[in-house]
Amino acid sequence: MASEKHFKYVILGGGVAAGYAAREFAKQGVKPGELAIISKEAVAPYERPALSKGYLFPQNAARLPGFHVCVGSGGERLLPEWYSEKGIELILSTEIVKADLASKTLTSAVGATFTYEILIIATGSSVIKLSDFGTQGADSNNILYLREVDDADKLVAAIQAKKGGKAVIVGGGYIGLELSAALKINDFDVTMVFPEPWCMPRLFTADIAAFYESYYTNKGVKIVKGTVAVGFDADANGDVTAVNLKNGSVLEADIVVVGVGGRPLTTLFKGQVAEEKGGIKTDAFFETSVPGVYAVGDVATFPMKMYNELRRVEHVDHARKSAEQAVKAIKGKESGESVVEYDYLPYFYSRSFDLGWQFYGDNVGDTILFGDSDPTSAKPKFGSYWIKDGKVLGAFLEGGSPDENKAIAKVAKTQPPVANIEELKKEGLQFASKI
C-alpha cells in the first residue's frame, strides 16, 4: 500500500514562488509539520534567473547552494536545513500526476498520496519544445532547453564538450538574448534565429531592438530574422550537426539552444478550476474558484488593479510577490485580519554582456526614445516612455543607476500627464527624476 501523508498546507511546485511562500509562512507563523513543498526537482527552491546568467559564466560561475531563494531579492538564503529547522517538509524528486481538488488529494507518479486543507498551486511553466511541433530531428543530442538546474547542467556539459564550436540559438526573447551572450562569452561562434522582425517583440519597440541587435552584432553574434528552424541534421552518433531554416539556409551547429517560450503547467487542474487567458483564474488574493485553493506565479491569471483587467505574468518578480500575497491572505483569513488587494506594477529586467535594462508599467500607446542609444558608446544609457491618453504608462531604461531605475518605476506607477511629447523627448530621464 502506497503511503499517505496529510498536511495543513501544501505548496505544489518547487520554484521561486514556493521558496518565497515558505519564507512568508515562516514569518507569519507555521507549526512544524503543517507545511509541505512537493517538487519534481531534486533541489530546494532556487532563484531561476541565475540559470541563464551566472550559471553559464566561464569563470566564477554560480552554483547551488549559492543561489537558493531568497538571495535574488536581497533576502536570506534558504538552505535545505532552514526548511528542516522550521518544520517544513521538502518532498523533492516527486512528480504529482493527479490532483483531485474535491477530495483535496494529490497522487504521485509512484502512487503516494498527499492530502491537504489548503493548496497553493505554484507549478510554473514548462518549456515549449520543438518536438511538440514534430520538427524533424528535434530529438537529436545537444538540442537543449533551459528551465531547471538539470537543463543548465546539460548545457554546461555541452559547452565544455564542444569548446569553441558553433552554437545556434533558436528564439529572440529573454532566453534567446541571454543565452546568445552566454555562449559568446564562452567563445562560441553564435547565430541567433527568430521569426519576428526584431528581438523581444512583445516588449521592445523597433528602436529599442535596433540597439541590442547592433550591440550583439558588434560582439560577433550573427542574427537571422524572419525565419524558423524546420529541421535538424545529426551525425551517426545522433549529435546535431546543422539547423535547416525555412528560408532554405543551413546553419552548422555543435549545440542548439531553444528558447521559444513556456506553457503554464495547469493540466492537472483542467475542468476543476476556472481558467482564463491560459492560466488559472484568481482573485486579488490569488484564491481560485475553488475555496482553499490558491494559484501563484506563472499559472495565475489575476486582476491587475492598475489597468483594471485580468492578466497573467511570467516573471520572477511577480512569482515572488504573488506567493507572499497568497500566504498573507491565507493567514489573514485564519486570524480575521484584512489583507490589502494585490496591486502589481509590471516589472521586467534582463542582463547580458555589460548591459542591463529595466522596464516598468504597460507598453501601450505611442513611444519616444531618449538618451544615448549608440551601440558603440562606451556606456550607453537610453530609455523609452510609452504614452497613452496623455499619460505616461510605461518606462524603459538601459544602463540606469539604482536611483534612476527607481525614478522610472515611479513614473509608471504614478502615470504623470504629458502636455508636450517633444518636450518629454528633450527632458528624457530628467522627467522621471522630477516625479
UniProtKB/Swiss-Prot annotation:
Catalytic activity: 2 monodehydro-L-ascorbate radical + NADH + H(+) = 2 L-ascorbate + NAD(+)
InterPro entries: FAD-oxidoreductase/Apoptosis (IPR050446), FAD/NAD-bd_sf (IPR036188), FAD/NAD-binding_dom (IPR023753), FAD/NAD-linked_Rdtase_dimer_sf (IPR016156), MDHAR3-like_C (IPR048618)
Protein name (record): Monodehydroascorbate reductase 3, cytosolic
Single Gene Ontology MF annotation: oxidoreductase activity, acting on NAD(P)H
Effect upon mutating E196A: Reduces catalytic activity 2-fold
Enzyme Commission code(s) on record: 1.6.5.4
Cellular compartments annotated: Cytoplasm
